[in-house]
Amino acid sequence: HLMTTDDFAIWQAKASDAHQGWISAQNFHAKPGKSIYFAAPDGRIDFAIGIFGNHAVWDGAALAASLPKGHWQFTAASDDLDAGLLESLALGWGLGQYQFHTYRSAAAPAVNYLTLPDGIHADRLIGQMGGIYLCRDLINQPPNHMTPAALQTAMETLAKTHDATLETHSGSILETEFPAIHIVGRAAEIAPRLMDLRWGKKGPKITLIGKGITFDSGGLDLKPSKAMEMIIN
């Protein structure tokens, strides 16, 4: 059950003696991102209460981390929990399950599953999480693996998956058309490149310009030593 701190205060005032005793024994204080669960007579979890506030994405992630591993479903304690808020909580829940296990030899830890509530745009939600997961995977790669060439391979895979187009510019064209990229990266062991990824033909045109920093910092010690150490770290 999803509640605000005010919802919880109202519910607690009407709760059974057993539930109130359990809340007291757990020293539970209703704060956004916190949760408490209650057991059925047979010892299994009967239900849980999760508290959310003004930062639904963060609260959703915190709830996913705090609850016992299993399959969960959101129910609202009041009509104030609209579809948009539910979607933000679900997004946070999904982002809280992220794991980077590319180099892991042992089995990945268990995760918490969520059955999406009615009214949520599942495709949009999964798309958002997929994009953030991809960025996290790229960032978490060790620097000797995530080179400009490796980033190009990742973008080629992304373009193929989503029927997008990718143009990659490298070599002499950078010297004449994109001199800043050429000057900074020309001494690097793995050559710099400019990637132009395009997707979709309908709707307004939106351009996002991203400066993809990989480990190659140009190959030239243009910064003070301490700053270069920070780049490496």
Tell me the role of every PLM-derived stretch.
Residues 1-214, 222-230:
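N-terminal hydrophobic/helix-forming segments and targeting peptides
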